[in-house]
């Protein structure tokens, strides 16, 4: 296995370092290459993602990313020039976000809710393509448009992946959209889900409007198994899902090219948190959980399962203790 490692900004290098230590325990011998991409490189060279580096990244089996973003760089520069460019250049059309409430983790929801689902979010279309514009800017008659692009090809490949995941889980798929208002895109999504669903008679399919889905994520999260949705709605509900599962410090994600033509990229959902960078207090759990997703994606099912069990064991026994970044890594390694 050839793994590219991008620590990035803020606490990114710190949490990724712990994930790499865990990797060496659970799967020794992985070939690792570290890339200096982020604010430091941008300030030094003016580069965000050189073509030569992008070409090298393509030669790896997967990418492990820490975090991107720094207050010394104008907002959006690193995010668009590095993070989003990686996703689009490497065709990461699936954003995978598991949502699970582990034993020992407190939820904002009352009681002990049963939460274990996964969101399959389309990652390269919708309103995130940069299609749109503005006229008469700065005048009382300014007009701004943001176009949501949805293609049959793009929707179908994401829906196909979601059905496959549902078949391997509890065989229940929920399409989340807003087809009563977004009629063109909504009709496309509904039709393709229906067409693909004919090949999966064992998977139950239901539809929910995005506003209803946000209610049920809070009031009855156990009804969800696999959620498939577009880029914007997925962006919103995945953060809500993280909030009810213990917060983004425990949220892992995968940006996946399901064709495996390009390396997929795995990262914790949390940001770079520059205010605590270098203090040794950042929680690396989400980065380590992202490593488990990476291993599973590459077919390393046994190490991935062991790592998931080790994380669960750590979370179940940590209590209210506050541990340093290194201590968390050590405890999960010990659980392995």
UniProtKB/Swiss-Prot annotation:
Q: Which GO terms describe its biological process?
A: L-leucine biosynthetic process
Any idea which GO molecular function terms this record carries? 3-isopropylmalate dehydrogenase activity; magnesium ion binding; NAD binding
State which pathway it belongs to: Amino-acid biosynthesis; L-leucine biosynthesis; L-leucine from 3-methyl-2-oxobutanoate: step 3/4
Q: Which prosthetic group or cofactor does it need?
A: Mg(2+); Mn(2+)
Annotated NAD(+) binding sites: 271-283
Protein's cellular compartments:
Cytoplasm
Site Important for catalysis: give positions: 128, 178
Q: What are the binding positions for substrate in this chain? A: 87, 97, 121, 211
As its record notes, the protein acts as a catalyst of: (2R,3S)-3-isopropylmalate + NAD(+) = 4-methyl-2-oxopentanoate + CO2 + NADH
Record's cofactor remark: Binds 1 Mg(2+) or Mn(2+) ion per subunit.
What EC number(s) has UniProt assigned to this enzyme? Answer: 1.1.1.85
Q: Which UniProt keywords apply?
A: Amino-acid biosynthesis, Branched-chain amino acid biosynthesis, Cytoplasm, Leucine biosynthesis, Magnesium, Manganese, Metal-binding, NAD, Oxidoreductase
Q: What is its main location?
A: cytoplasm
Cite a GO CC annotation.
cytoplasm
PROSITE patterns in UniProt: IDH_IMDH
Q: Where are the transmembrane segments?
A: none
Residues bound to Mg(2+): 211, 235, 239
Entry-linked Gene3D superfamilies: Isopropylmalate Dehydrogenase
InterPro entries, from UniProt?
ICDH/IPMDH, IsoCit/isopropylmalate_DH_CS, IsoPropMal-DH-like_dom, LeuB_actb
Q: What family is it from?
A: Belongs to the isocitrate and isopropylmalate dehydrogenases family. LeuB type 2 subfamily.
Q: What does this protein do?
A: Catalyzes the oxidation of 3-carboxy-2-hydroxy-4-methylpentanoate (3-isopropylmalate) to 3-carboxy-4-methyl-2-oxopentanoate. The product decarboxylates to 4-methyl-2 oxopentanoate.
What quaternary structure, including any partners, is listed in this protein's UniProt entry?
Homodimer.
Annotated protein name in UniProt: 3-isopropylmalate dehydrogenase
What is the scientific name of the source organism?
Mycobacterium leprae (strain TN)
User: Gene encoding this chain?
Assistant: leuB
């Amino acid at each position: 296995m050839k793994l590219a490692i991008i620590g990035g900004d803020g606490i990114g290098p710190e949490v990724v370092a712990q994930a790499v230590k865990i990797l060496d325990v659970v799967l020794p011998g992985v070939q690792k290459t570290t890339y200096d991409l982020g604010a430091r490189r941008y300030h030094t060279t003016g580069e965000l993602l050189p073509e030569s580096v992008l070409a090298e990244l393509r030669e790896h089996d997967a990418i492990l990313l820490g975090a991107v973003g720094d207050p010394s760089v104008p907002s959006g520069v690193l995010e668009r020039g590095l993070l989003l460019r990686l996703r689009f250049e490497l065709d990461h059309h699936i954003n995978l976000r598991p949502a699970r409430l582990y034993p020992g983790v407190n939820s904002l929801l009352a009681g002990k809710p049963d939460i274990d689902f996964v969101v399959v979010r389309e990652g390269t279309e919708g309103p995130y393509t940069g299609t749109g514009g503005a006229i008469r800017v700065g005048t009382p008659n300014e007009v701004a448009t943001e176009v949501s692009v949805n293609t049959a090809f793009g929707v179908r490949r994401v829906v196909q992946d979601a059905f496959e995941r549902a078949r391997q889980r509890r065989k229940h798929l929920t399409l989340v959209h807003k087809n009563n208002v977004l009629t063109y895109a909504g009709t496309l999504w509904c039709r393709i889900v229906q067409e693909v669903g004919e090949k999966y008679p064992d998977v139950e399919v239901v539809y929910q409007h995005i506003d209803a889905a946000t209610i049920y994520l809070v009031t009855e999260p156990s009804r969800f198994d696999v959620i498939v949705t577009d880029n914007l709605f997925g962006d919103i509900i995945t953060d809500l899902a993280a909030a009810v599962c213990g917060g983004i410090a425990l949220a892992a994600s995968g940006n996946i090219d399901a064709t495996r033509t390009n390396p997929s990229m795995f990262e914790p959902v949390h940001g770079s948190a520059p205010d605590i960078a270098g203090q040794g207090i950042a929680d690396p759990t989400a980065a380590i959980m992202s490593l488990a997703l990476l291993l599973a994606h590459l077919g390393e099912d046994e190490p991935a399962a062991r790592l998931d069990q080790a994380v669960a064991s750590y979370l179940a026994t940590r209590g209210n203790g506050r541990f340093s970044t290194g201590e968390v890594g050590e405890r999960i390694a010990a659980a392995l």
